[in-house]
From Swiss-Prot:
Gene (UniProt): queA
Organism whose genome encodes this protein: Sinorhizobium medicae (strain WSM419) (Ensifer medicae)
Assembly and binders: Monomer.
Keyword annotations from UniProtKB, A to Z: Cytoplasm, Queuosine biosynthesis, S-adenosyl-L-methionine, Transferase
Name of this protein: S-adenosylmethionine:tRNA ribosyltransferase-isomerase
Family: Belongs to the QueA family.
Superkingdom of this protein's organism: Bacteria
Length: 360
């Protein structure tokens, strides 16, 4: 499909720079393809009223790490211009793949030192060597530290990697370390938050429990590739980034039991949906699964396991707007987004939410 079919005009002031407070006070646009009404303006706290006893919410419990690193490149005895690197996938205890800016100033063999400029690492300087250079600004870094020691150093010198549309408007601060993290995050490794989950609070969980809604957790470590623009003119020519995920056998069995008794699998966020669909067989049976997924969902995809999707509002021509268009229908989602923009919904990671029913 032509990528420009997924384009729309998004005013700059529609992008939220801070989350709603409290988290569960965000607005929620309910989208029912072919329903009456198709679009309904509600709030996140209304979520339980759209679910039935026995339905199951699926959350991504990945935890964001401060993966934005500001460093200085060394080549021989010469110090060059500062470089910025966003870690996006760990490939070994001492190695990370990262996106570099400006990538043209790095080559294999270069050394990069982090943690200077008043933010020194408590363990000493954090240094890495550029081991490989790939496409689209990607490099592989081999750090001098490894395992937990490296994790501690990254926590000390790193910054929360705010999405570009937010980072271009303001710098990250101490609030983001809390705001850009779900209350149930536990598995460290993401460099972007599963943002649909940011709306959940203890109050909302209590309401869902009272309504008899199950909750289950899977893990997909969201990578910085989620921010990459689609540069191809046709979706067939786009290469999707891969992310590491895991669905354990107990969770798979419980979700299959929900489906067998007529309950619905409600994915909280596109990351949960992509992982559940990666783990599902053609008949919708969900299996234990672990590995890298590069699943790219566009209109025409036949959903196997997910019945409903709660998700924030996405950017024009993004792979995530393509995904929601596949789920609820392109024209329905174009109408939904036009309504959201006209009525002041807040977009992107810190923005409002939508609840999508799957198109038949």
């Amino acid at each position: 499909m032509r990528v420009d079919l997924f384009d729309f005009d998004l005013p700059e002031d529609s992008v939220a720079l801070r989350p709603a407070s409290p988290r569960d006070s965000a607005r929620m646009l309910v989208v029912r393809p072919g329903g009456e009404p198709v679009l309904e303006d509600r709030g996140v706290l209304d979520l339980p009223s759209f679910l039935r006893q026995g339905d199951a919410l699926v959350f991504n419990d990945t935890k964001v790490i401060p993966a934005q690193l500001e460093g200085v490149r060394y080549r021989g005895e010469h110090i060059s211009t500062p470089v910025s690197l966003t870690l996006h996938m760990r490939v070994a205890p001492d190695r990370w793949k990262a996106f570099a800016r400006p990538a043209r100033r790095l080559k294999p063999g270069d050394r990069v030192s982090f943690g200077h400029g008043g933010n020194a690492c408590l363990l000493g300087s954090l240094d890495a060597m550029v081991e490989e250079k790939g496409d689209a600004g990607e490099v592989t870094l081999r750090f001098d530290l490894s395992g937990p020691s490296l994790d501690e150093a990254i926590m000390s010198v790193g910054h929360i990697p705010l999405p570009p549309y937010i980072a271009s408007k303001r710098a990250d601060d101490a609030r983001d370390r809390t705001d850009y993290q779900t209350v149930y995050a536990r598995e460290e490794g993401a460099v972007a938050a599963p943002t649909a989950g940011l709306h959940f609070t203890d109050r909302l969980f209590a309401m869902l429990d009272e309504a008899g809604i199950e909750r289950h957790f899977v893990t997909l470590h969201v990578g910085a590739g989620t921010f990459l623009p689609v540069k191809a003119d046709d979706t067939d020519d786009h290469v999707m980034h891969e992310e590491i995920g895991h669905v354990d056998a107990v969770t798979a069995a419980k979700l299959n039991a929900v489906r067998e008794r007529g309950g619905r699998v409600v994915c909280v966020g596109t990351t949960s949906l992509r992982l559940v669909e990666s783990a599902a067989a053609e008949d919708g049976t969900i299996h234990a699964w672990s590995g890298a997924t590069g699943i790219f969902i566009t209109p025409g995809y036949r959903f196997r396991a997910a019945h409903m999707l709660m998700t924030n509002f996405h950017l024009p021509k993004s792979t995530l707007f393509m995904l929601v268009s596949a789920f609820a229908g392109l024209e329905t989602m174009r109408d939904a987004y036009a309504h959201a923009i006209a009525t002041g919904y807040r977009f992107y990671s810190y923005g409002d939410s939508s609840l999508l029913f799957r198109k038949d």
